[in-house]
């Protein structure tokens, strides 16, 4: 049996060699004509239209022309003899076709693609068989058809440090079935009601502290799957819990008035309440997973980066000497550390090999959020005036600083086929360091795409890189299939997921288990890429979030306090992420 093939296609030439050959078969009715002489020929008009979007069809007129006075019927059949799976299907309006003396007969060939037909070159054999099982006398005909993808652009927006319980206390989502809790249990087995807090650092109830989201904080909160240790998570060392911190600082939810743009997106499109970060800790490994499906130092290592940097504030291959990152085994033991410069295949390599354009938008180089700077063959670091600097061609051409350039590129019709968009600290939603503009930032990107021609063929994936130390009630699942990456390893905690597209399911709650590997697998299937062989192997491909055959959703602007012009014109210095 052929292996399953992608659910989406990229623009590709679908060659349909309609080989009008004779195959054994039968026809009905009587026939007349000279014995031993050719009885008919076949012709095929060019497929019309010559280009279709996957899920549509094209037609050709097949003409059966009698020869040597033949009168009788000719049966037509077609079969796909090469190409991808599922292949296009074909059918005839009339078969058998009757021909009489000098009068030809016709039939319409319809070649139908489905939304899941992969790009590739296909050969269709169209066979004719008369009453004596004779083939047409003139041999093969060749037709060609160009297909365009349903999804041609994917934008991954990667925000910071939230859980569904913390960020999405939305009555509409809850009414629609989203699994959101209003209370939780602490290590003393007490029920703690979640309390409101502002998203940013300004306002009447500011979020002026951060919580640890190190691997040790994960272990405390997870508590072997009981999810009752959130109260044991300390405030981040960078903040040290100010005196006015709440009695239960981990058991908080963001004021709904601060995140209405997020609610609007989640209510209109698809919201995932079983999206988990792949790693059990903070941002540096999370950003490696969203780029590569792994945070391992090498392709053969069974250890994975588990923490942010120690010994220096600059990350990746341009980190200062003495900077290290902790490594963890699949069993959850942090036992060693190394310099944070890695070498293995990333999704960008698969995109480059297939000729699929990509860009990674980030606020700065050397950040724990700028994943490509930790991949040696992308960074290709050199020393300039005593400072390490990334200098590789992929870095120079595809890593774009600052992150607001994505808004300019959309407006100028220069959006790559795959984009990662990383926020500045101010717009990141990260506790203590954000100014509350994250919902406007995300909405600005969505609105720019929604009001452009890109809307018709774009999928926007919005998620958050880790849980940030906030309480969430859903325990992560164990990756335990025994064969793929991470077998026996537990996912990190839930993070929100919003899928925005004209082909996203409307007002849909996805209860399917997703993780960062799902985003990679979605990109792989969309562009017919091979598997990275890491977290993508065990992941789903987000297919339950889409309906590629429904009427595309008409975009409606997402109301927000700030628009694209604000972020394009904002020249404030970048706010660095936390380093805990």
Functional labels for PLM-detected ranges:
Residues 21-25:
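C-terminal motif of bacterial Sec signal peptides marking the signal peptidase cleavage site
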Residues 14-18:
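Core hydrophobic alpha-helical transmembrane segments of single-pass membrane proteins
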Residues 1-13:
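Bacterial N-terminal signal peptides that target proteins for export
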Residues 148-580:
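N-terminal pro-sequences and low-complexity stem/linker regions of secreted or lumenal proteins
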Residues 26-148:
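Long beta-sheet-rich domains in secretory-pathway and surface-associated proteins
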């Amino acid at each position: 049996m052929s292996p399953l093939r992608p659910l989406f296609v990229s623009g590709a030439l679908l060659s349909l060699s309609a080989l009008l050959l004779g195959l054994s078969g039968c026809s009905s009715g009587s026939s007349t004509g000279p014995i031993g002489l050719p009885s008919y020929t076949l012709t095929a008009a060019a497929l019309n239209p010559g280009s279709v979007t996957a899920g549509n069809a094209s037609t050709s007129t097949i003409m059966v022309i009698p020869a040597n006075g033949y009168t009788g019927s000719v049966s037509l059949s077609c079969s796909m003899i090469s190409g991808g799976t599922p292949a296009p299907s074909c059918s005839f309006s009339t078969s058998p076709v009757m021909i009489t003396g000098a009068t030809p007969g016709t039939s319409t060939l319809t070649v139908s693609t489905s939304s899941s037909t992969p790009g590739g070159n296909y050969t269709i054999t169209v066979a004719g068989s008369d009453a004596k099982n004779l083939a047409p006398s003139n041999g093969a005909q060749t037709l060609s058809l160009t297909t365009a993808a349903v999804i041609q652009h994917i934008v991954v927006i990667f925000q910071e440090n939230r859980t569904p319980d913390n960020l999405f206390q939305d009555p509409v989502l809850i009414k629609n079935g989203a699994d959101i809790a209003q209370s939780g249990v602490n290590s003393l087995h007490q029920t703690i009601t979640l309390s409101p807090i502002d998203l940013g650092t300004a306002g009447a109830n500011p979020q002026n502290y951060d919580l640890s989201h190190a691997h040790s904080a994960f272990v405390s909160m997870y508590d072997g799957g009981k999810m009752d240790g959130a109260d044991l998570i300390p405030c981040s060392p960078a903040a040290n819990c100010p005196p006015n911190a709440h009695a239960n600082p981990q058991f908080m939810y963001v004021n709904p008035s601060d995140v209405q743009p997020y609610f609007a997106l989640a209510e209109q499109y698809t919201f995932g309440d079983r999206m988990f970060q792949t790693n059990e800790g903070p941002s540096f490994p999370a950003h490696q997973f969203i780029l590569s499906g792994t945070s391992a130092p090498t392709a053969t290592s069974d250890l994975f980066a588990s923490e942010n940097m120690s010994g220096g504030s600059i990350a990746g291959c341009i980190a200062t000497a003495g900077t290290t990152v902790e490594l963890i085994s699949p069993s959850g033991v942090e036992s060693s550390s190394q310099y944070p410069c890695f070498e293995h295949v990333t999704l960008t390599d698969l995109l480059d090999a297939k000729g699929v354009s990509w860009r990674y938008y980030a606020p700065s180089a050397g950040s724990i959020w700028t994943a490509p700077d930790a991949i040696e063959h992308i960074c290709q670091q050199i020393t300039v005036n005593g400072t390490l600097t990334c200098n590789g061609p992929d870095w120079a051409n595809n890593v774009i600083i600052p992150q607001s350039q994505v808004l300019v590129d959309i407006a100028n019709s220069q959006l790559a086929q795959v984009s990662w968009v990383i926020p500045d600290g101010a717009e990141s939603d990260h506790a203590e360091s954000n100014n509350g503009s994250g919902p406007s930032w995300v909405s600005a990107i969505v609105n720019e795409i929604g009001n452009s021609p890109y809307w018709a063929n774009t999928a926007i994936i919005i998620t958050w890189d880790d849980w940030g130390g906030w309480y969430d009630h859903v325990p992560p699942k164990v990756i335990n299939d025994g064969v793929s990456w991470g077998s026996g390893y537990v996912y990190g905690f839930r993070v929100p997921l919003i899928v925005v597209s004209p082909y996203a399911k409307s007002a849909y709650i996805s209860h399917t288990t997703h993780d960062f590997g799902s985003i990679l697998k979605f990109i792989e299937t969309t562009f017919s890429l091979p598997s990275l062989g890491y977290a993508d192997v065990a992941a789903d491909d987000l297919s339950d979030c889409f309906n590629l055959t429904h009427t595309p959703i008409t975009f409606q602007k997402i109301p927000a306090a700030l628009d694209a012009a604000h972020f394009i014109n904002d020249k404030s210095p970048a706010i660095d992420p936390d380093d805990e």
